[in-house]
Amino acid sequence: LLFQAVLVATRPTACWVRAVYAFDTASSTEWAFPRTFSADTWVDISATLEIKLAAMACYTSELRDYPHPRSLDSLRYRARAWGNQQCLDAAEVFMTVRRALHDGETPV
């Protein structure tokens, strides 16, 4: 429901959002068949991975023990595995849901 609301709210009109991305959700994204997550955008988080993990540690009700996908160790491994795909130490990945082009722009 939230996903559909975002798509409606970000329709390309006079004042529009340039791009809408979905993010990888540990222990949820992999259960979304047949619409599984397919990363197409990588952001280098090598310098901020430990800050991300410290922030996640504040959400004790969301954390689980390793090897659960939402354990701190699993999140670290996941970020490093995504990063390795682009020769980075760690990365956060996104999937483009919609990308609107400005006048004269061409798709990448």
Region locations from a protein language model:
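Metal-dependent de-N-acetylase/amidase catalytic core
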Residues: 1-108
